[in-house]
Amino acid sequence: MAKATTIKEALSRWEEKTGQKPSDAREIKLYAQIPPIEKMDASLSTLANCEKLSLSTNCIEKIANLNGLKNLRILSLGRNNIKNLNGLEAVGDTLEELWISYNFIEKLKGIHVMRKLKILYISNNLVKDWAEFVKLAELPCLEDLVFVGNPLEEKHSAEGNWIEEATKRVPKLKKLDGTPVIKEDEEEES
């Protein structure tokens, strides 16, 4: 089997392709590397100016080494093998969007550190309990959530009460699974 691509190798390919220095760049795309990236290694800490980092469609198992990314606002980790949200604390004060759909996340422990998070795409993961879902209510800025394809959503959508139950538990949401949320008091006023 081919050896995994390291972040360092992916960055040097990216630099060759774009002609930009990774340490200066605001947006870096390292998605779908062949062979795939398996580890978020220490080379990431050189990306001091990066605001948007895409590592989607690789084989990453753990979120790590984000401490040098002082300006990171958008992190794309969709279609990897990530099982939990540990490692996000390093970007808890800056991250506004986390795209982490199509992984193996069951528990949302550690999400509370994301104090600026506005957008969370966490569809097609393994979250099955309300006890995990309610942790999203701890995010003071969260307004757009895509949660479709998690066992919890599938069960309640089949019962016809998903949007009602989800927005009751995370009342600040403005958009759920791509649909604008209309609050009952807004309905009564119209």
Swiss-Prot record:
One of its GO terms (cellular component) is cell projection. One of its GO terms (molecular function) is dynein heavy chain binding. LRR repeats lie at residues 47-69, 70-93, 95-114, 115-138. The modification Phosphoserine is found at S56. GO terms for biological process: outer dynein arm assembly. It comes from the Eukaryota. It is found in: Cytoplasm, Cytoskeleton, Cilium axoneme. The modification N-acetylalanine is found at A2. InterPro entries: Leu-rich_rpt, Leu-rich_rpt_4, LRR_dom_sf. Belongs to the dynein light chain LC1-type family. Outer (ODAs) and inner (IDAs) dynein arms contain the molecular motors that generate the force to move cilia by ATP-dependent reactions. There are two mechanosensory systems that monitor and respond to the mechanical state (curvature) of the axoneme. One system involves the central pair microtubule complex and radial spokes and the second system involves the outer dynein arms. Interacts with ZMYND10 (via C-terminus). Interacts with DNAH5, a outer arm dynein heavy chain. Interacts with tubulin located within the A-tubule of the outer doublets in a ATP-independent manner. Part of the multisubunit axonemal ATPase complexes that generate the force for cilia motility and govern beat frequency. Component of the outer arm dynein (ODA). May be involved in a mechanosensory feedback mechanism controlling ODA activity based on external conformational cues by tethering the outer arm dynein heavy chain (DNAH5) to the microtubule within the axoneme. Important for ciliary function in the airways and for the function of the cilia that produce the nodal flow essential for the determination of the left-right asymmetry. This is Dynein axonemal light chain 1. It comes from Rattus norvegicus. The gene is Dnal1.
